[in-house]
Amino acid sequence: DEGVVIENAGLTEWPIPLLGRFDEAYLEVPPEVIQLTARVNQKYFVCEDEAGKLANAFICTANIEAEDGGAAIVDGNRKVLAARLSDARFFWDVDRKKTLAQHAKGLERITFHEKLGTVADKVDRVAKLARWLVEEGIVKDADPDMAEQAARLAKADLVTEMVGEFPELQGLMGGYYARAEGLPDAVADAIRDHYQPVGQGDKVPTAPVTVAVSLADKLDTIIGFYLGGEFPTGSKDPFALRRAAFGVLAYTADRLRVSMTTLFRQAAEPHLAFFYCEPKDVGRPYFEAALSAFNWDIDAEDKHEASPLDYRGPFGATNANVFAGIRRLPRFFADRLKVKQREAGVRHDLIDAVFALGGEDDLVRLLARVKALQVYIETAEGADLLAGYKRAANILKKEDWHGTEGEIARTGEEDPLALVDDPDMKAVIDAKMAARHAGEANYALEPAEKALAGALSQAEPRAAKALAEEDFAAAMAALASLRAPIDRFFEEVTVNAEEENKRAHRLDLLARFRAAVHKVADFSRIEG
């Protein structure tokens, strides 16, 4: 135990370790309680037997070489430890006289936060969310009844005598008490582990019921505080929201396929109902407006969209706070994701490049795209394509050229395909672009123009098919086929030709190239 070694070395000038023993009857108490009592309160080392189980032995550290070999010192320390272990055994016995469900009733007397109600209120929200996660198939192979039961009992140990004395054991003791009363192992494990992971590098639970309860608990905390206007700032994070976000991302970025927007809305619904005094009364319009405002836009915080400020709910909740929280959530999670992925060697600018596409809130899919992009962009071919993209983007920016899609938006020209009943509006716009400029190239195209147009015609459907199949390596390969044609285009073609039809066609070709690249990622966000 390195921590106890350092502490004892600092407390003594001439450290002498002495072995002592305590009554075996105390081993009935959970080993973590004995370890905590010995280590934290007494600065003792605990010992294990040959089987690796906790032994009824301890090592204390004296500051002198006693004439009796330390017998008196050991006896004195044994008595002190025995008194503490006696208290612990008393707590253990008293707590087990009630079921966790009976203990949980005491949560109604504990305030979680003035804006978020009692711990009992939080437990109710978490239980419903955990059940929803299972019933919607987001967390698979879990029993919804067990998930809800575990969530309703997860905080019950907060009112027990043992956790009152040893707060560090919250969750852990709940698991022991659950087993002691014969609850299913899946429920006991979920109660024990639902606080995990508590930070980077911590163990991430994999048991389905535990995942449902842990994810629901962390989501409820983050969403609640953000909607209540309580944000982490700088080095201050009094409610450990960054740590909770790491826990959420450990599930949603590594294993669970789920829309973050869907998660946000589901977790926010009970909070919004609470803030707006239940949706059935005057707050209903605000409730619905806030719920529909959730989206996965990491730039939403910078847009400062107007929100209704004329409503003040209970406990100081206002629309200003609610809508500010909604706008800040995507950026908060995006920043946490960058920090989390930095240790895995993933570049933050590539995460930005994929986030900038908008609407990609399945983090498992997003990271798969980012990693494929990083593999490609770090090759010589990828660097060349990035350089070609930036040159094209700079020309288009200088000319304020947005392609046909932008022309329609600026001029308001009626789109002849606007009435086409096609759910894929991008397909409509692409058809419009093709129809509008089909006759513009009424001049002899230079070979490099033909080559780039032909490469785009081949790369666009290949990339679209690969993206639809989530084969991001194949999508990068499709982009790679554009590298040589775009280089040749810049070497052989004068974009800003004097003839307007040539200039327009060539700028449209570059806009088409930029759009093809943007289907994979926004290369303007990539450094280099």
Predicted features by range, described:
Residues 1-528:
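Amphipathic alpha-helical "coupling" segments that flank catalytic cores
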